[in-house]
Amino acid sequence: ARLRFGRLRTVEQFYTFFSRDGLKRFCETGTLDDFPEAFVKPFPPNMRRQLLTALADHIRTGDVTGRLLEPGVFPDYLSMTTSERSGVGFFTTEHFPLQDGFCSVQIREPNLCRAFHGWLTHLPATVHTLGAEETAAVLDELARGISDTQ
């Protein structure tokens, strides 16, 4: 997880979208839906608070375009990465209802990549997400609610 987060910090304009349910699961368990406990050790409570607070701060400054998705915009059981240059990747999380395990699909066709990338990068300006300040406030609130016994 640290390697992935480190790589994401090198992206010029980083977009991240998440669900309230996914954030709540992270706060409660310390695991990320796309990094299940079978592969990555859960984050301890103090690190969960630090990650959420840091993400909220980066969203407020505009270093990261992070938004909380409204329910139903994107399914919780899928994760997606996109880049105009490197393609689009979909992979299942442990919440995928039709299988036991993981699967992924990589798309390299340039027009499809541009279409998916364009869809994601336009989301922050739509009614499908909370605004930057609202999203940051939710992250701060969730961080404050993490107890050391979780």
Please name every model-derived segment.
Residues 1-139, 143:
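Hydrophobic protein-protein interaction segments
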